[in-house]
Amino acid sequence: ESTEDEKAMQQMVERLFPEYASQFSFEQSEKIDKDWYEIEAQGGIVRIRGNNANSMAVGLNYYLNHYCLTSVSWYVNDTVEMPEVLPMPPAKITSTARCKNRFFLNYCTFGYTMPWWTWKDWERLIDWMALNGINMPLAITGQESVWYRVWTKLGLTDEEIRNYFTGPAHLPWHRMSNLDYWQGPLPKEWLDTQEALQKQIVARERQFNMRPILPAFAGHVPSELKRIYPEAKISRMSSWGGFEDKYRSHFLDPLDPLFATIQKEFLEEQTKLFGTDHIYGADPFNEVAPP
């Protein structure tokens, strides 16, 4: 019976070029200290072995690039141009990874076209990431749903929370504490759909042996928190990008006991929704001066 990694690879080729799927075979083999793959032609079948799905995907990409002279883009509507007859490698090809951790994406990427992506767009990007050996992707979609739960638990109202968030296109800069409120309030329906999307994203990334890097609390808080915690050491950040002062964000002193409380609440709520691989990203002072 096929392993989960072998199934993941077979499903990938069925998504990318279904008419050729039966001509590929994937075999998960014993692990060594490094990620590795092996490509070999056997009886008209391209056999790709590796220690996991991620490694086998890199092997598949090598075969596509060097033998089919084609490439897979991360845009779902781009077809993969394949030769009429699959070329068979004349000799066995083997390769091992040069580095263990292979990171991809940044905070701003999630504010260009990604706010409007559907699962089909993400599915293709994750295939592309696997083909290119990415195993530590930044995964920050849907975090507002986590924050909504945390801020509600701490006493903020629905209106206060959703007004504090920016509109979808500016959320990456809101997350990096550049601005608040701009083009809000964020609809509750949007929070819910992004939460569902993130569940699909991290599940598929883990299927390809990736460890999604989830967000952690970096000190950025709603100004309304001062209403509930008047003694908290909350400072105002510098202005950013020419926006009016009313959009400036607020920062909680990491030495304030409330900081650890919020961090714990956030990580616990996030883990309930999305699981964890125990790797987190935080970007507290992007293009703003620390208080």
Which residue stretches match the model-derived regions?
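Short Lys/Arg-enriched alpha/beta "domain-start" segment
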Residues: D5-M9
